[in-house]
């Protein structure tokens, strides 16, 4: 299945994301950029998925490029709420530039992994022409899962926001 945000080529990736976030117990997002309005739109669902399992989001380009005050505050606020629910959940920032886009939904043994061009933003989810595809090959799924683990776990690549440090230099 491919999603391009065009009705004659799979439709909006945002609709696919919304459908899956309600069905699965775990979500990992790796995105270069994000939109405050997308964080706000999906905040309740992100918190619910953290209650059911785990919700981890890594943003890959802001350490070097910076963020607006509203972007910074939205990440800090969401991170605090996610960690309060589940310490395994949270917001991560890469210290090396990461521009890829991966969305992994999991429940029990079932995994859906999408890879493509959509950032976690309104333009990525509906208004830009993008190209995202569901990965069905089990070997590729395994490699992508390992890569996500690497992004989230390797301290030379990324760091989790610390809710006790609201002026964390990862967001400046």
Enumerate the predicted regions with their spans:
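PLD/PLD-like phosphodiesterase catalytic module centered on the HKD motif
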Residues: 1-172
């Amino acid at each position: 299945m491919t999603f391009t945000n065009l009705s004659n080529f799979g439709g909006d990736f945002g609709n696919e994301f919304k459908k899956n976030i309600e069905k699965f117990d775990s979500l990992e997002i790796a995105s270069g950029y994000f939109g405050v309005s997308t964080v706000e739109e999906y905040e309740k669902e992100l918190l619910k998925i953290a209650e059911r399992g785990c919700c981890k989001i890594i943003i890959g380009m802001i350490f070097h490029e910076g963020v607006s005050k509203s972007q910074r505050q939205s990440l800090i606020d969401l991170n605090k709420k996610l960690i309060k629910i589940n310490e395994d959940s949270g917001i991560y920032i890469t210290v090396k530039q990461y521009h890829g886009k991966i969305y992994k939904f999991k429940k029990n043994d079932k995994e859906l992994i999408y890879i493509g061009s959509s950032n976690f933003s309104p333009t990525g989810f509906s208004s830009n022409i993008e190209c995202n595809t569901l990965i069905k090959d089990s070997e590729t799924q395994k490699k992508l899962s390992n890569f996500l683990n690497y992004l989230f776990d390797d301290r030379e690549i990324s760091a989790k926001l610390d809710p006790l440090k609201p002026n964390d230099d990862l967001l400046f």
